[in-house]
């Protein structure tokens, strides 16, 4: 493909990475548990936000064994605010497999790592290359963006065939410094060749082999398939309080936000009369509606348009768990969709 020589990529990238990389806490270790944790946290979450969570998580659960034995509520509380809670549930499941099958020692073979719950090809490649210097690529959105521009390829980068092709071509040129090369590709895609903005081609160590730069197309790449429109769902959320306590309930063990605490809620936007009738159906006696607040929360494929009703009830019953404000803050992991209403309440407490 024109003048593209991928074999030059390691020799161009590695010196640049060693001189210019950001200092991040998970780059100071070869411990596979730490690297695995950071990679899972960094999915769908900004680097700056992850730093604090990463430190707190490892302080509370410093070993795979501690993670495997952690109580679910405590685990969810450590993860609170990161979202995508299936990530942390799979972390625990994988830790339990490591404890039972590998005597607590993180497996060092790619196929064994890939077989762990919640670990796909990207995470397995990242852990194995960074922790063990195995020559296996870790192809994420950053790497796909870099490769699309390097090769001047307009194929949508979210197609599985494109990802497989990138992985195969990278595997053929992996150097013995596999961990540094993996991180160099990620770093280039996160900084110089970043998303949603003009690439900084003048600062790029790869511009002399980059076809996108040579052809003037780098700014138009990468291409993605059209996004599916999010489904809109209306919900009414009840922030029920009695004598300084608030009603919470656990969500079902499977599905969206599985096993997490929530304020009672129902489908649709209820008017005052229907809302009061719903509270009575819950087995509670409503006293006074204190206020109503509108919020929205976006999941990957769904948008919740929520009407929050703050309401005082006569007794703390109805089959709910009743928490003080202090207990909610210390013990109950509220997903962001519901924490929006709790933060509103805390401002007024």
Positions of PLM-derived features:
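Intrinsically disordered, low-complexity, charged terminal extensions of DNA damage-control enzymes
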Residues: 1-22, 28, 190-349
């Amino acid at each position: 493909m024109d003048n593209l020589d991928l074999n030059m990529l390691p020799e161009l990238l590695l010196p640049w990475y060693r001189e210019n990389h950001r200092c991040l806490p998970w780059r100071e270790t070869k411990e596979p548990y730490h690297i695995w944790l950071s990679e899972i946290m960094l999915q769908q979450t900004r680097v700056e936000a992850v730093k604090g969570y990463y430190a707190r998580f490892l302080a509370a659960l410093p070993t795979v064994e501690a993670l495997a034995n952690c109580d679910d509520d405590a685990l969810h509380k450590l993860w609170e605010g990161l979202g995508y809670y299936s990530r942390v549930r799979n972390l625990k499941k994988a830790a339990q497999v490591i404890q039972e099958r590998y005597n607590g020692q993180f497996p060092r073979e790619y196929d064994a790592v890939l077989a762990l719950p919640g670990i796909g090809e990207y995470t397995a490649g990242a852990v194995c290359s960074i922790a063990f210097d195995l020559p296996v690529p870790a192809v994420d959105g950053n790497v796909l963006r870099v490769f699309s521009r390097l090769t001047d390829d307009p194929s949508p980068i979210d197609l599985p065939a494109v990802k497989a092709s990138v992985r195969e071509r990278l595997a053929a040129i992996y150097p013995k410094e596999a961990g540094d090369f993996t991180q160099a590709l990620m770093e280039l895609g996160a900084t110089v060749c970043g998303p949603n903005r003009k690439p900084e081609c003048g600062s790029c160590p790869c511009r002399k082999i980059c076809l996108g730069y040579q052809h003037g197309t780098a700014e138009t790449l990468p291409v993605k398939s059209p996004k599916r429109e999010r489904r809109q769902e209306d919900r009414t959320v009840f922030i029920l309080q009695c004598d300084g306590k608030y009603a919470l309930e656990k969500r079902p063990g499977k599905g969206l936000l599985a096993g997490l605490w929530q304020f009672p809620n129902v489908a649709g936007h209820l008017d005052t009369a229907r809302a009061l009738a719903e509270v009575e159906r819950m087995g509670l006696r409503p006293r006074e509606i204190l206020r109503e607040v509108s919020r929205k929360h976006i999941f990957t494929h769904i948008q919740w348009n929520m009407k929050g009703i703050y309401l005082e009830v006569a007794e703390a019953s109805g089959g709910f768990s009743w928490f003080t404000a202090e207990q909610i803050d210390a013990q109950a992991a509220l997903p962001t969709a519901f924490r929006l209403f709790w933060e509103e309440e805390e401002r007024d407490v």
